[in-house]
Swiss-Prot record:
Disulfide bonds: none
Entry GO terms, CC: cytoplasm
Active site (record annotation): K275, R349
Protein name as annotated: Probable cytosol aminopeptidase
Principal subcellular localization: cytoplasm
Gene name of the encoded protein: pepA
Amino acid sequence: MSKRPSISFSEFEVPQKGVAVVLVAKGGGFADEAAKAVGDAEKIARIADISGFTGALGKTAEAIETTPAGVEKIVLVGVGEPGKLGNDDWLKIGGAAFSQIGNAERVTLTLALPETTIAGDEAADVALGMVLRSYKFDRYKTRKSEENGEPKHAAKITICVADTHSARKAFEVAEAVADGVIQARNLVNEPANILGPVEFAEEAEKLEKLGVKVEVLGEKELKKLGMGALLGVAQGSVRPPRLVVMEWHGAKGKEKPIAFVGKGVVFDTGGISIKPAANMEDMKGDMGGAAAVTGLMRALAGRKAKVNAIGVIGLVENMPDGNAQRPGDIVTSMSGQTIEVINTDAEGRLVLADALHYTNDRFKPRFIINLATLTGAVMVALGQYHAGLFSNDDELADQLYDAGQSTGEKLWRLPLGTEYDKMIDSKFADMKNSAGRYGGSITAAQFLKRFVGETPWAHLDVAGTAMGSPANEYNQSWASGFGVRLLDRLVRDQFES
């Protein structure tokens, strides 16, 4: 696996060896501290001129140059217009900086800009961007550093910033969030022959060491609860299903919890309605929603969030054996509502139907947010830069949208309505699990809405963003961990501010 850098914060100092990284604004402006870090201002101007570097956000320039103090390499990182930087931009700056340090074991980043005060939380976001950029899933590669020129040791990075106390304090929180994102990425990247429902549940149980209460329900308990929708999906696999309930109690008193529910199909062949062979290997990531919920619970516990939160994940494998669910089957969900199975590849909503009802019925939460790699249709509508947002509550939808804007994990709201709801009515049961080609992501959301009652609820369709999304400055991984930072920000803004 990747070597995670060790990051510390310091007052401004002249780097003594290794790599010196400095910030440059659009148009070439830089702080006096940056000039001191590399020896003189002319070096920065010369490197920028030779490289055609303009200081645009996320762009870099580098030179193998020594300084009187012993630095061997200088890296310039563009920040664009300093007055317009947001949280996501500071992550981009950190990720861009990390991308240029190579095999260096000692790095000093001078975090200063002309006529600009960089706050402690902004410095922490830079550090978070570096940690997230350092991530690499290479667990199964037997030849690593000798082939790829990777460093033998993790980089030691010193970030020089004016307010070191605030930066350290903010990074304690950011590092817990990084742990959650990395866990989500690891779970999604893991191959399905290694990570089945049982193994996933075991990973979730490890959160107990952070103070999370974890309960794992097996097939016997699920049958007793009447989870016919979830069990119908699982019956084609020899690997038994699991429902994992994670509880974090961080609020004072007995406040009603907030709840997060994740779809955890550890591998999705499509079942009897089998998928085409091309790219089916990507369906190891069809548990991206469950991975995000697990990563979120780790982040909340790791930073001791002052909130009561519930995470519920339904874990199954969708396989086409002789006992598999068939098109035309009718199953009874835990809610008592019956479902005609039109397409066994519309299985995620069946898993979520029971998980949502269970969560709502048992915990009576303030709201429920579910995440799922639910439909290809949402990718047709939105591509891979936004996840689909559906909600029965405008206030919750607005809060989620704002959290997405501030973290860069962006959402776009799509409609719900009675016209779409009628499309999932069935001739033979209360509803059907697929309404056909048109409005596929919307009718899937309408299906889920039938299992949450009047509770404020939002559904995030992360099919385009949880895996295989375009790389950026702080994520080069196939699995992005999308949703962890977004929902952590929602919790901070709405319950801890």
